[in-house]
């Protein structure tokens, strides 16, 4: 399952990168005489690639306003300008928009006209990173699949903001100003298909409440989280990647079962205050525990049990799946305990 997720995300990233590079190559190599085919509706501040009639490039132009968007446009690039507002009018004909990049502007919540974004019924990707937002914008179109809000000043999530975003799969709120009081028990209600949640680099002291059941990737690095409630992972039974690096987790703050959650494949707990290795699942493949206060590794506690009736050859398939273990930056002294290697027979790398 994890490899499938990574492959999908990698394909999306590579596809976007290659597509963008191809447009720029076309721009550099194309004959200016060919540009006239779309000049009739192309905003004079922007570039309309002749080989990609559904793309509109208006980035790095010093724009203070969004130009009128032609109806044929699917992909809109407006990053790195001086735009402060998102009014309805420029988008009144842009009924086909799938992708909007407004990163690195000066947009505030007060500058977003109420229906400007929600009227875009086919919008899938919305990038508003590096702006001046203080709360998650609302309302948003139901069609939205990815919402990128990193590096703003977001400290509030108005009630009901996500209630109709059932198609959203990725929510990026990293590097904002979120506190625990930004969340209600029903904050994430409606995000039925959310797969990745990134709230790294905020000011959280507690785990966010009641995450959507389908969430598979949770990134909470660089907060001030001190503990994890008992049975917290019961509501997110599909979580596979969990990052809690650079927090304030201690042994007393962990659930009694530790991280013995069968769905978790990659667990990152670097730079915390742990003094012992927590319990883990036999399905875990990558464990990062570097830069804690761990003095020794009690293998009898952390080694997931394997049925003794299994033949030796089957123990590799049904036994612990741990392949990568980081313990450097602790108070552990080599050599590596032999019973650690005996328990985790699939280990490919151990860093102490």
From Swiss-Prot:
Location within or outside the cell: Secreted, Extracellular space, Extracellular matrix
Pfam family, one: LRR_8
Residues annotated as domain LRRNT: 33-71
GO cellular component: extracellular space
Start-end of each LRR repeat: 72-93, 96-117, 122-142, 143-164, 167-180, 193-214, 215-235, 238-258, 263-282, 283-304
Disulfide partners: 42-48, 46-58, 303-343
Entry keyword set: Disulfide bond, Extracellular matrix, Glycoprotein, Leucine-rich repeat, Proteoglycan, Repeat, Secreted, Signal
Glycosylation sites: 93, 167, 222, 260, 298
Main location: secreted
InterPro entries to which the protein is assigned, alphabetical: Leu-rich_rpt, Leu-rich_rpt_typical-subtyp, LRR_dom_sf, LRRNT, SLRP
Similarity remark: Belongs to the small leucine-rich proteoglycan (SLRP) family. SLRP class II subfamily.
Name used for this protein in its record: Keratocan
Naturally occurring in which organism (per UniProt): Bos taurus
């Amino acid at each position: 399952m994890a490899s499938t997720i990574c492959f999908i995300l990698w394909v999306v990233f590579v596809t976007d990168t290659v597509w963008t590079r191809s447009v720029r190559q076309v721009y550099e190599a194309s004959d200016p005489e060919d540009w006239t085919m779309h000049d009739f509706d192309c905003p004079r501040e922007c570039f309309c690639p002749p080989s990609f009639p559904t793309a509109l490039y208006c980035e790095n132009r010093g724009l203070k306003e969004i130009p009128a968007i032609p109806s044929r446009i699917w992909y809109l690039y407006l990053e790195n300008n001086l735009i402060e507002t998102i009014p309805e009018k420029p988008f009144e004909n842009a009924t086909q928009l799938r992708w909007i990049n407004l990163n690195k502007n000066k947009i505030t919540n007060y500058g977003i006209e109420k229906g400007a974004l929600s009227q875009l019924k086919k919008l899938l990707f919305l990038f508003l990173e590096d702006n001046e937002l203080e709360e998650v914008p609302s309302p948003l179109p139901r069609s939205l699949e990815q919402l990128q809000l990193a590096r703003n000043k977001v400290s509030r999530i108005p009630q009901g903001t996500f209630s109709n975003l059932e198609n959203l799969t990725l929510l990026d709120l990293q590097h904002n100003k979120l506190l625990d009081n930004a969340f209600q028990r029903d904050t994430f209600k409606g995000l039925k298909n959310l797969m990745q949640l990134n709230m790294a680099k905020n000011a959280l002291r507690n785990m966010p409440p009641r995450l959507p059941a389908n969430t598979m990737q949770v990134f909470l690095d660089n907060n001030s989280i001190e503990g994890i409630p008992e049975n917290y992972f019961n509501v997110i039974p599909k979580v596979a990647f969990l990052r809690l690096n650079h927090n304030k987790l201690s042994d007393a703050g962990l659930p009694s079962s530790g991280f013995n959650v069968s769905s978790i494949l990659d667990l990152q707990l670097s730079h915390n205050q742990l003094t012992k290795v927590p319990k883990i699942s036999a399905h875990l493949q990558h464990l990062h525990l570097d830069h804690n206060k761990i003095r020794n590794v009690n293998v009898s506690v952390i080694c997931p049990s394997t049925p003794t009736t299994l033949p030796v050859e089957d123990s590799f398939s049904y036994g612990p799946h741990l392949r990568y273990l980081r313990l450097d930056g602790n108070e552990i002294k080599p050599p590596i305990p032999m019973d650690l290697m005996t328990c985790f027979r699939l280990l490919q790398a151990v860093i102490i």
